[in-house]
Amino acid sequence: NSTGILYQNINTSTGGLAVVRDNVISIITNTNTANLALRSLGISMFSNNILVERNRVFGLSNAALSPLAKIAALYLRSRADDVNTGMIRNNMFAINTTTNAQIKAIDMQDGVVKANIYHNSVLAEGSSATNSYTLFKSATAAADVKNNVLYNAVSGAGTAYAIGLETN
């Protein structure tokens, strides 16, 4: 796995806010060609008590051969006891790659993730053997999504979606 910025096991009970602001994250590459579910992530957050703003993430790639491998500019997960709502705003995420991996530019994974996602520009292009998404939300994750530009021009065997909503 390859990650640009990783915040993990953030203790939100103390009221602390994790802020990721004004970063340029690029050339995050997984070069392992194994048939494994490896990930290339620009920003990975494990908390709802977050502010992610004014970041630019681009140049992500993943050479893993597994269709379970993943590329995400922003990967969100959270604990069951985290009652906060995160803010994701004014970011630029771009993925342009040829891969077998899943492309989910913004990936809200756990059912307890809660986030406001406002005013972001997200581009996915290149070629993928699997479906691709500029924004993917798991079955029970909560999101307020407003005023984003989501453009998916990925070609290949999979289908390109702007938004993917997993159902129960």
Question: How would you name each of these model-derived features?
Answer:
Residues N1, G15-T31, N48-A63, A72-R77, ...:
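Right-handed parallel beta-helix
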Residues N1-T12, T33-S44, S66-A80, T99-Q109, ...:
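Extracellular beta-strand/beta-solenoid scaffold signature
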